[in-house]
């Protein structure tokens, strides 16, 4: 099989976590399913076909973390409405940052910062791309 025929099926960020068990619990609250947990080693959570991977980082400082990823969803407003009642603060760590707004680059997005300082920007296309 030539390289041109190999289909890339997905991508998963690998983010730091001080406590993988606590990270799993946080993401399960957000509607992810725990796919695999190896305490003090590795965690995989899934929501639909999207996976987030985490590695143990005991010395991580959430306030200085620069890790993050972008999650494309079909409806940013609906996901924000699902997460808002969870009572996440709008400041500090963790936080549900802002409410969905339209960007100049064609996405409607908001952000979440998890307990380890990982930034997740979540967005949906305002109009079909292309």
Region locations from a protein language model:
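Conserved short beta-strand elements that form part of the metal-binding/catalytic scaffold
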Residues: 35-67, 119-124
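Structural motif
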Residues: 10-12, 49-51, 68, 95
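Conserved beta-strand segments that form the floor/walls of ligand-binding pockets within enzyme
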Residues: 10, 16, 53, 111, ...
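N-terminal beta-strand motif that seeds the catalytic metal site of vicinal oxygen chelate
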Residues: 1-22, 69, 124-130
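Acetyl-CoA-dependent GNAT
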Residues: 57-58, 97, 101-102, 124-129
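Vicinal oxygen chelate
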Residues: 19, 69-119
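Short glycine-enriched loop/turn motifs at secondary-structure junctions
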Residues: 6-9, 61-66, 104
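Core segments of cupin and vicinal oxygen chelate
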Residues: 7, 15-52
């Amino acid at each position: 099989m030539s390289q041109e025929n190999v289909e890339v099926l997905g991508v998963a960020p690998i983010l730091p976590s001080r406590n993988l068990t606590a990270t799993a619990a946080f993401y399960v609250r957000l509607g992810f399913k725990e796919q695999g947990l190896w305490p003090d080693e590795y965690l995989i959570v899934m929501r639909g076909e999207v996976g987030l991977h985490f590695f143990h980082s005991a010395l991580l400082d959430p306030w200085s973390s620069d890790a993050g990823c972008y999650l494309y969803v079909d409806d940013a407003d609906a996901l924000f409405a699902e997460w808002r009642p969870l009572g996440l603060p709008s400041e500090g760590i963790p936080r549900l940052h802002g409410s969905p707004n339209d960007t100049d680059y064609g996405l409607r997005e908001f952000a979440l910062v998890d307990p380890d300082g990982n930034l997740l920007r979540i967005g949906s296309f305002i109009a079909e791309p292309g």
